[in-house]
Amino acid sequence: MDELKIHKLDEVIESFINYLIVECGLSRNTILSYSHDLQAFIKFLLSKNILDFQDVRPDTITSFIISEKQRSLSINSITREVVSIRMLFKFMLSERKLQRNPLASIASPKLWKRLPSVIPTYKIDKLLSIFDIKTKIGIRNNAILELLYATGARVSEVAAIQTDWINLEYGYMKCRGKGSKERIVPLGTKAIEAIQNYLNTARPKIKNSQNSTYLFLSKGGKPLRRENIWVIVKNCALKAGIKEHISPHMLRHSFATHLLENGADLRSVQEMLGHVNVSTTQIYTNVSKQHLKAVHRQFHPRE
């Protein structure tokens, strides 16, 4: 890594801090706050091998916001960091040290509050690898979490699934969503394996299972309610050593975001999620924007 470039980043920050002290007359605590925020930003830039503020793009800022959100920083802390970065860029523009403002197209903090919480893929892997598949409940819980992540289904939709809504041969599942609207959602290989194992080895051992048409049953043979599934997901996250709050809806968010990050088109994701309007699905493009922008930079002939 180019030490001169790293030094150049620090030089710009130093000039900005001097400006805040001399020109703006800000208090020591405010100066320290700006400095702390900007050092966090520089650390992020270096992790992405960005060694010059000229190379910062809007998707870099979006990626930074998501990174801070995944570190469980509060919205207020992230907003303060972005305000500090915005002030830095305004200073650089006024000093002709920056040609364009990467923050110009970034939405207001109100939008960030609406950004879905997404579970990183490495934590998904941890979450899906903790089950005791020698017990009927472990096998059932494994099937539930694999299905949640594989389909992006709402927790209420998963609780309502009937056994004949699943077609493992063709790898599809019927979902009944809001307003009783039905949709067909593909199942991935891992989810098919987990559900097949549950149907073959665990569900038949559950009390009164032969008398129920519901896919997921409690120990007593009653259909699992959505509240039960919330508790299952929460307990599985704790068992996996994940300290952050994890919910079924976060698995839905992660399903959509990870699909978009890996190149899925928005309309297909909309259909799988059961959104009536594509604008509802577009919130996930704000989360995965850094990936899409990178694809554009790599493949567009005029980029």
Q: Residues of each region from the PLM?
A:
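Conserved catalytic core of the tyrosine transesterase superfamily
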Residues: 1-303
